[in-house]
Amino acid sequence: MSLLDYFKTKKEPSTAVTAKERLQIIVAHQRGERGAPDYFPQMKQEIIEVIRKYVQVGPDQVSVQLEQTDDNFSVLELNVTLPEQS
């Protein structure tokens, strides 16, 4: 029986599974922003604008996140996907 299973085509994940995964990502993102200070969205936008002055990047290539730990520390994480140089 396992030999027949090997040759069967694998099913693509259903749209319900894909939608559930996307919803989980959105909920996790919103939970992460729940403890962020009020000025965080404006600060995030200003950081992205400064990066765009020097490097041509799209809004989806810059990620800014604020993580707060139990030890009363805040970590500002900034990830930028830089374009390849020609």
UniProtKB/Swiss-Prot annotation:
It comes from Shewanella halifaxensis (strain HAW-EB4). Prevents the cell division inhibition by proteins MinC and MinD at internal division sites while permitting inhibition at polar sites. This ensures cell division at the proper site by restricting the formation of a division septum at the midpoint of the long axis of the cell. The keyword Transcription does not apply. InterPro entries: MinE (IPR005527), MinE_sf (IPR036707). This is Cell division topological specificity factor. Keywords: Cell cycle, Cell division. Belongs to the MinE family. One of its GO terms (biological process) is cell division. The keyword Cell division applies. It holds the Pfam family MinE. It comes from the Bacteria.
